[in-house]
Curated annotation (Swiss-Prot):
Gene3D superfamilies: Cytochrome-c3 Hydrogenase, chain B
Gene expressing this chain: hupV
Any one GO molecular function term: nickel cation binding
Record-linked Pfam families: NiFeSe_Hases (PF00374)
Family named by the database record: Belongs to the HupK family.
SS bond partners: none
Species of provenance: Azotobacter chroococcum mcd 1
Origin: domain of life: Bacteria
Entry's transmembrane regions: none
This protein's name: Hydrogenase expression/formation protein HupV
Amino acid sequence: MAGRLQVEVRLQDGVIRAVDTRLQRPLAQLSRLLVGQTAEAALARLPLLFSLCAAAQQVAALRALERAAGWTAEPEVERGRSQLTELELIRESLLRLVQVWELPLPLERLKVLVALCRRGAARLQPLTSFRAPSLPADPHLQETLAELAAAWADLELPITADWLGPRLGRWQEVVLGGPPPAVFDPADLSALLAQLRSGDTRASIAGQPRITGPLCAAEAQLSAAAQIEQHVGALLRHTAQAIDSLQQPSPPPAVAGLLAGEGVGLAQTARGALLHRVCLDEGTVGAWQLLAPTDWNFHEDGPLRRRLCGVRVAEEDAGALLRELILAVDPCVAFEVKIIHA
């Protein structure tokens, strides 16, 4: 289901005076499509609702539904599901790096890496069924993961500054504002759960925004050029780390304090942490809530507002700067930029 991001900036005398971030996501409509369904029927609908991060959406939903139903998946099942989301993360990150940031990766090499990700994901697809049993030992999967690691190790990629330098040079003198929000921590889940139970689906903890994903690994930089370079470099490092951890992916964090019939599922995407919260009532969905990385990273008081307010930029460059920073934070929806000259 599509959403849209609108970012409006008020510029006065060459200084950004205000940043208004409006994220429109059809989460209420999505919930209505899933409420009243059985777990199996709801899972069957998910691929029709999401195109980006489709595997992560399935895995987060599965974890939430199974927990709500009182079912604990076997460790090997959870391991395979984490491998599935990591393969999707790798594929989507590589495509983003090449298509948006022009990573100098030869097309044939990219095709090989993407094909290996898809081949591995196909072997793991049976684990996306409700209460899935463990899969038998799969030498073809292990061979695919080994080929992917070898293909990545064989690459000789330049450092981020070398290939991004010409594109970002115009932003070297643009000095950014204050630091971004704090990082979303699974330790905050109990506070977040209390909010969700009350019907508050805002992406914040005690009213304060958080950030997630590769964005968290990017150190706050003084210049816009250095900040964008940090974001893109963090995405590249995140991809490499996912490839390295494929054989032993991290288990999902435990969620304590759940009520009877309530389940929470977490999964990692190329953009950060994805969360589904589900309540089952006699086998059917009574409530369904979702928080995606874009909800966190494009909060109205998120990194865009905090880093851009008070920034001095030439009027003719404001739109281009804003677009580059939005691309660096990486929304999962289409976006539009509006500059108001006060």
